[in-house]
Amino acid sequence: MAAAAAAAAAVGVRLRDCCSRGAVLLLFFSLSPRPPAAAAWLLGLRPEDTAGGRVSLEGGTLRAAEGTSFLLRVYFQPGPPATAAPVPSPTLNSGENGTGDWAPRLVFIEEPPGGGGVAPSAVPTRPPGPQRCREQSDWASDVEVLGPLRPGGVAGSALVQVRVRELRKGEAERGGAGGGGKLFSLCAWDGRAWHHHGAAGGFLLRVRPRLYGPGGDLLPPAWLRALGALLLLALSALFSGLRLSLLSLDPVELRVLRNSGSAAEQEQARRVQAVRGRGTHLLCTLLLGQAGANAALAGWLYTSLPPGFGGTGEDYSEEGIHFPWLPALVCTGAVFLGAEICPYSVCSRHGLAIASHSVCLTRLLMAAAFPVCYPLGRLLDWALRQEISTFYTREKLLETLRAADPYSDLVKEELNIIQGALELRTKVVEEVLTPLGDCFMLRSDAVLDFATVSEILRSGYTRIPVYEGDQRHNIVDILFVKDLAFVDPDDCTPLLTVTRFYNRPLHCVFNDTRLDTVLEEFKKGKSHLAIVQRVNNEGEGDPFYEVMGIVTLEDIIEEIIKSEILDETDLYTDNRKKQRVPQRERKRHDFSLFKLSDTEMRVKISPQLLLATHRFMATEVEPFKSLYLSEKILLRLLKHPNVIQELKFDEKNKKAPEHYLYQRNRPVDYFVLLLQGKVEVEVGKEGLRFENGAFTYYGVPAIMTTACSDNDVRKVGSLAGSSVFLNRSPSRCSGLNRSESPNRERSDFGGSNTQLYSSSNNLYMPDYSVHILSDVQFVKITRQQYQNALTACHMDSSPQSPDMEAFTDGDSTKAPTTRGTPQTPKDDPAITLLNNRNSLPCSRSDGLRSPSEVVYLRMEELAFTQEEMTDFEEHSTQQLTLSPAAVPTRAASDSECCNINLDTETSPCSSDFEENVGKKLLRTLSGQKRKRSPEGERTSEDNSNLTPLIT
């Protein structure tokens, strides 16, 4: 007894020292009487793995479920070492382990029901335990020990693999009726003899059938367990479907469907709206039901499914694998597929119909969960202070419209208008304004003449900003085009007069003002154009308001409809992209029909300035003195539409070619007298520069041609040779004196036009440049105009020649039907020699040799005043022109008239003289039978006697 206690104490010390894991050692021998001395080597046993509830220790009995495999650790104390090798028994039936070896071994034998292996006398029909251990037929086949004992890693312990087979049909019920399964005891072979360990040593194993759970509770049949799992899964799917179908319907959407849906949708929305109105109560009810169903399903599957399975191999790591998470995995998959995916797929497409048909069930569930869910719903309402719903903000509504574009029946323009209206509050003026550099503006000192009004009308704008000075950002007024209704461009009214009269208010906004605010201001009638400004605090100094541009009502409307509005005058589709409008049959307005006629002055000057100009030219400018040109012809010349001109100065492009009146080494044929403004003159190769003002003139040599005689040229020799003619009076003329005419054979005023317009002989090339410095008004007379004026003056001063009476043949009293046009047949060849513009027969008494030397003078582009019309007002619309081919000329040495435009109404010849000369000339010409050559040229005889006229 003392030896056994000492051995037990020694084994306990070794176990405490070696087993650091803290495992509980099941030393059953300490709980029972001392075993026989022969069995002292087996001390106890315990299962290595009890996870999953398949193997457990209850009441000193090892319990295992059928179909499991587990690892068993046994503790023993080896006997004293043998002095000699054991002598084997002669036969296997006399006490050997049954395998032919002498190694220790464990086997299980089945105990009879109710026996428990307590005493051999309790079961008289069976032999005692040690005797049964020797018989292999008594070894249990349902509990199998796999392989021999293996070292357990700790002295005095060993490991052995135990597998419990499936119970045969009917054994589970019999075992269950007797105490919850079949009972097995342990037999141990120590190498010399078999030892039976039963209930006395705590070495019993009870195998329970699968009908019992981990705690030994009786489980229902498999079909009943499957049906319960399906019912719980269906309940979870029901709650999930109701939650998706009811809570996905927003109250706002239900109101929309109730008012604008189909008949079925209106009825369904009406039924659902009452339940959906209590959103938080409904939400708590459905979530509580779904959570309970999912939890019940997980517990049901845990008790119904095996947590793992074992194998038959010798290695635990290969065959004894357990899956305690298998029920959780099956539950998760079932809930995911059956309670989430399927309900969502159906309810997302038919949510309203499902919700309307399940209203009664929903009300029943809400009533059942009322004690718990109603207070919780009220608490949520108090905490959130609004119903749980889907509220669409402006941004969300915009994104909803964009996302629903492929599925909605809205056209693109309607969608753009909706989006533009919703985005109006998010945009500021700076994003849509027209920059100041792109605005059409007028200076406050502008004059509303024809050019300015035409430019305003051509721009197409109805409201035009007016700025003061040279800074465009200094906007002082607004001009409305309708304000020009009573303004005559001929009056040259100052713009400031009109703007001060109407006194339109300026509407200014800041660059960060929202478009909806500006639209409200425009709707109040203040103005449809606003000036955009910002506070400029950059740099040093005080902040100031800086004008950035303008914004109009049209700009805001374009942002609302998200499209450009184009009218007939727009040049760009977008002010920011600068994309030009395609020219699609678009015509620019031509206002030339409203201009002054050619007989009126295009540039208006005061009568005082016209008189001063006339006096200055008649007294100071040599070619226009009364010696060469009469004052009456000079006045007509100044009143010519193209003589007095204006030129605007562009500050942005000061070196523009149109700013030069003369350019060095560029041939010209006109004379210029500056009336208003300033010019800069650059002289010679040295580039000497100086400024000149009003009443300075240039280019006198340009109008002096070979049409003058040698004496005439010598009279104006100081004028003809000046390279730089910049004088206010003839006394200040300087330069070369060209005293001879380039054409010596033609020295009078009737020179040849071929020689007159020869580029090598008659073109004047100045060696100076004249550049304007401001807006100028000047007199510009071309060489042709001056020659026409000379000829008109010469014919005006010539007396009527009596030789012209020779043209009369006694029929002078017969007046023509139209003045200057005789009554001749339409097929008369003389008609082809007449021109309907400004024709007049005049005599040349100074040197005419015969009456046939009559010429017709054409005064090209020279207007005559209405006050000089005398006797021929009723015949002023028709004139007679004689082609140069029909005009007989005299020798080249004689002076002759040029082709000059001369009004018959102001001719110095009398009316009788004109009528007689016209009739005689036509009759004379009609009597000559001359034919044109096939090439349309005159005969050589005619060409030899004619000199072409100036055109």
UniProtKB/Swiss-Prot annotation:
Restricted to brain and testis. The chain crosses the membrane at residues 23-43, 222-242, 282-302, 321-341. Residues 433-495, 502-568 form the CBS domain. Residues 116-135, 731-753, 795-830, 920-951 are annotated as: Disordered. Keywords: CBS domain, Cell membrane, Ion transport, Membrane, Phosphoprotein, Repeat, Transmembrane, Transmembrane helix, Transport. It is a multi-pass membrane protein. GO terms for cellular component: dendrite; neuronal cell body; plasma membrane. Its main location: membrane. Residues 218-414 form the CNNM transmembrane domain. The modification Phosphoserine is found at S850. The modification Phosphothreonine is found at T821, T824. One of its GO terms (molecular function) is transmembrane transporter activity. Belongs to the ACDP family. Shares weak sequence similarity with the cyclin family, hence its name. However, it has no cyclin-like function in vivo. This is Metal transporter CNNM1. It comes from Homo sapiens (Human). The lineage of its organism: Eukaryota, Metazoa, Chordata, Craniata, Vertebrata.
